[in-house]
């Protein structure tokens, strides 16, 4: 071997090793020297440099084979790796199942079969069969004797050539008129491309032809999956576009023509006539050109910067007026004009220019007028705009509709405000508006408003000369800042219309009203369409008031607070009930140890309680509480008395259903201590102190069904003292008693998601109770004891000033003061000398609170 060859070999090997080391965790290189032959090598995550001959090689993913100068590979199977054929190298009878075969300049690939993968040619490819995958011929590369079967693709780029191509049915060719030369046969006969002229091309199944400026294409067939793209200045005649084929062209093409369902279409001298587009085909109408009687169907597109007349947009096709997107660049034109368009389940976007007389129909029909573009006049609608049969009409910002007669029939017009930082409202003017079972929706631009404060909200004023028919208007208000959407009819208004207003939690000043509708006359009737004819605005509900002077205003109804207000009151009123339910477990424990001798005990009690509550402030809810209390206590005996001292820890969860919709939750964590003293004559005194941590969550419902969410934490503390006398007569005992209970929460401020502000003051219990308990003790033969018992009590609640402030509308008082009765029954049982249990149930009613049940079940272990 010559020294120069050795140096070249070393340099090549080192280059490959360095490159692969950078991109592969494991890269092993082997060399087949000049004159050497190897057979059956499998390459996986390694590299082979071939200067000699490599037969029957398999290249799997991660493997590479480099056929160097005068190197040869025979019968190589490529399954995902790379084969590089360098200058004067050759690959014979290769099969590509996946991966790449790259033929560099001066290299050759002969008798190659592509099942999948890519054969990329900068040199030469001879006798290639493409069953799948792609053969790409780059500039100065060439392919001779190519058979393209169904699913295969031959791509010839500018400056490349392909001779003797056999394009079988379903085979695809992708190329340009700037290819050096391409010729062969297809199922329609012979085809060729040379010197910028393409003849008899068949485009299908992913094939395409790009006709460049000043180039020509004659008698092109665009079948399903094919694409013919005609650049500005290109000429195409005899186009036969089949179903599923695509044709993309602009009116700046010198000429495009061919047959269609109307006979013949043409684009010539800047005028398109009778052009039918479907299956993703596209037409661009350039400035100072025009399109006449164009039909867009089946996802076709049309972009017009010029003038079009009689265009039909249907079957999910898309039309753009005053805007085009080409080669990554967007162009606008205020000179664009569209006249007499019909949209039938298609979409038209108006970016700039003027649209004169348009009809939109069908559930998928959309006419959307975009907000004014920078440095361009607002888009204009002129003449009749008829929207019907479930179609949608949308306008963004201050577009020019002052000369439009809008007719809405069973359809929706969405007016979208242009959000700005200058707080300029959107003003929209019409010539006339007619409605029939239609909706007009005024709304914000659907973008994140994090940088726009509530005071900068952009409202809409819709002004029309006349209004007739029937339908609904959906408006936004900001009563607190005296702003809203408005409808202004300068002339006559006739018909029946409903106004829908969005609920909000923020309150205006007391007595404020806000005018939403004004007319110049006529017998039109406007009513509030919200559920119940009311809208939630802060603390109180509002109604739509006919002022008697052809104007209608939102006015406050102080007789009824909003559901959000009741939600705030409900949560405040529920917390004392949580404290009380947890307290009952400790009272049961203290009652069960009267006259019982033990040293130390651990106990637990599970509770389930239901409370139905109404307050004078208007709150109303149903509370279901479940919880568990754990305790430990010890008994200390003296000469004539005994004492008990203990600690408790508990948790409870309350599900609260609000009477006017929505729900809340309270998770309570409690810690406390208790003590009792009992004299041998039966006199006793019990005491409990307890603190709570409340985690409160609100999922309220406004009148319109929207959610008002909020959460906050609060704390509570309370004490209970009970004194009585226990008489024992044989197995019977009677225990009359008096008790006093006090409880308070700390004040908390929070805000709901609808903007309502709540300032909850101290919520308190101050209660006196008088009652009597009766029990009977039974000893069973198996050693078990039973003690059924009954208790009845009368409670008097004195706390009548539990105040809650909502927004700035004064304070509401959750007053549950009054008299109530409580009736209880239970049973205690000892199973063993150290294990006992109890069950109880109670009913209470009075002072705005009904407790259908309060159940307890517990066990006690003494030791």
Swiss-Prot record:
Signal sequence segment: 1-29
Recorded superkingdom: Bacteria
Keyword match Signal: yes
InterPro entries named in the record: AIDA (IPR030930), Autotransporte_beta (IPR005546), Autotransporte_beta_dom_sf (IPR036709), Autotransporter_adhesion (IPR051551), Autotransporter_pectin_lyase_C (IPR012332), OM_autotransptr_brl_dom (IPR006315), Pectin_lyase_fold/virulence (IPR011050), Pertactin_central (IPR004899)
Keywords, comma-separated and alphabetical: Cell outer membrane, Membrane, Signal, Transmembrane, Transmembrane beta strand
Listed PANTHER family: AUTOTRANSPORTER, C-TERMINAL REGION OF AIDA-LIKE PROTEIN
Protein name per UniProt: Putative uncharacterized outer membrane protein YejO
Biological classification of the source: Bacteria, Pseudomonadati, Pseudomonadota, Gammaproteobacteria, Enterobacterales
Gene it is expressed from: yejO
């Amino acid at each position: 071997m010559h020294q120069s060859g050795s140096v070249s070999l070393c340099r090549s090997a080192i280059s490959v090793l360095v490159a692969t080391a950078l991109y592969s965790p494991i890269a092993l290189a082997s060399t087949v020297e000049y004159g050497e032959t190897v057979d059956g090598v499998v390459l996986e995550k390694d590299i082979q440099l071939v200067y000699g001959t490599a037969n029957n090689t398999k290249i799997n993913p991660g493997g590479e084979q480099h056929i160097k100068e005068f190197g040869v590979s025979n019968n190589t199977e490529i399954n995902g790796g790379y084969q590089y054929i360098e200058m004067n190298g050759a690959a014979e009878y290769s099969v590509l199942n996946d991966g790449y075969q790259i033929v560099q300049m001066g290299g050759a690939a002969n008798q190659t079969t592509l099942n999948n993968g890519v054969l990329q040619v900068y040199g030469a490819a001879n006798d290639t069969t493409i069953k799948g995958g792609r053969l790409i011929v780059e500039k100065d590369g060439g392919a001779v004797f190519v058979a393209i079967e169904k699913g295969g693709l031959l791509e010839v780029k500018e400056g490349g050539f392909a001779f003797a191509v056999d394009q079988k049915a379903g085979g695809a060719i992708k190329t340009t008129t700037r290819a050096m030369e391409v010729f062969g046969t297809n199922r329609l006969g012979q085809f060729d491309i040379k010197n910028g002229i393409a003849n008899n091309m068949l485009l299908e199944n992913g094939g395409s032809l790009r006709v460049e400026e000043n180039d020509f294409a004659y008698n092109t067939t665009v079948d399903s999956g094919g694409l013919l793209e005609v650049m500005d200045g290109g000429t195409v005649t005899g186009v036969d576009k089949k179903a599923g084929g695509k044709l993309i062209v602009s009116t700046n093409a010198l000429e495009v023509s061919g047959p269609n369902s109307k006979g013949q279409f043409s684009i010539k001298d800047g005028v398109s006539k009778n052009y039918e587009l479907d299956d993703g085909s596209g037409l661009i109408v350039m400035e100072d050109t025009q399109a006449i009687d164009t039909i867009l169907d089946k996802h076709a597109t049309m972009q017009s910067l010029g003038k079009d007349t009689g265009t039909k947009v249907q079957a999910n096709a898309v039309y753009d007026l005053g805007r085009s997107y080409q080669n990554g660049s967007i162009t606008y034109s205020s000179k664009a004009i569209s006249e007499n368009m019909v949209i039938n389940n298609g979409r038209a976007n108006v970016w700039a220019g003027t649209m004169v007389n348009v009809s939109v129909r069908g559930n998928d029909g959309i006419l959307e007028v975009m907000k004014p573009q920078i440095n361009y006049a607002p888009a204009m609608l002129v003449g009749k705009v008829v929207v019907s049969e479930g179609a949608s009409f949308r306008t963004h910002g201050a577009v020019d509709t002052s000369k439009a007669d809008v007719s809405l029939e069973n359809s929706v017009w969405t007016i979208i405000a242009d959000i700005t930082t200058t707080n300029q409202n959107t003003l929209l003017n019409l010539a006339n508006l007619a409605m029939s079972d239609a909706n007009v929706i005024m709304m914000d631009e659907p973008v994140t408003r994090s940088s726009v404060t509530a005071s900068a909200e952009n409202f809409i004023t819709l002004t029309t000369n006349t209004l007739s028919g029937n339908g609904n208007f959906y408006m936004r208000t900001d009563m607190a800042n005296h702003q809203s959407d408005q409808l202004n009819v300068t002339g006559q208004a006739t018909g029946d219309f409903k106004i829908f207003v969005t609920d909000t939690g923020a309150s205006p000043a007391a007595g404020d009203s806000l005018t939403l509708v004004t007319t110049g006359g006529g017998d039109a009737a406007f009513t509030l369409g919200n559920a119940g004819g009311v809208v939630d605005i802060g603390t109180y509900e509002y109604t739509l008031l006919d002022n008697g002077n052809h104007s209608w205003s939102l006015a406050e109804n102080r007789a009824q607070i909003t559901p959000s207000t009741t939600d705030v009151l409900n949560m405040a009123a529920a917390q004392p009930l949580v404290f009380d339910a947890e307290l009952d477990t400790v009272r049961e424990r203290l009652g069960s140890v009267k006259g019982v001798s033990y040293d130390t005990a651990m106990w637990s009690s599970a509770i389930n309680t239901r409370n139905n509550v109404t307050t004078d402030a208007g709150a109303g809810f149903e509370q279901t509480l479940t919880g568990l209390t754990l305790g430990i206590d010890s008994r200390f005996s003296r000469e004539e008395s005994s004492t008990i001292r203990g600690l408790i820890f508990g948790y409870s969860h309350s599900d609260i259903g609000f009477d006017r919709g929505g729900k809340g939750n309270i998770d309570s964590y409690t810690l406390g201590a208790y003590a009792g003293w009992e004299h041998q004559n039966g006199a006793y005194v019990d005491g409990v102190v307890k603190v709570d941590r409340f985690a409160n969550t609100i999922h309220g419902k406004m009148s319109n069904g929207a959610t008002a969410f909020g959460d906050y934490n609060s704390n509570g503390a309370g004490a209970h003292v009970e004194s009585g006398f226990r008489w024992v007569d044989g197995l019977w005992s009677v225990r009359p008693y008096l008790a006093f209970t006090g409880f308070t929460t700390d004040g908390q401020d929070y805000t709901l998601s609808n903007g309502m502000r709540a300032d909850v003051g101290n919520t308190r219990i101050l209660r006196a109770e008088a009652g009597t308990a009766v029990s009977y003790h039974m000893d069973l033969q198996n050693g078990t004891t039973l003690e059924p018992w009954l208790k009845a009590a009368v409670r008097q609640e004195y706390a009548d000033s539990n105040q809650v402030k909502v927004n700035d509308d004064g304070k509401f008082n959750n007053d549950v003061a009054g008299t109530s009765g409580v009736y209880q029954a239970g049973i205690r049982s000892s199973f063993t000398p150290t294990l006992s249990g109890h069950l109880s149930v109670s009913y209470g009613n009075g002072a705005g609170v009904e407790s259908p049940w309060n159940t307890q079940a517990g066990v006690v272990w003494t030791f």
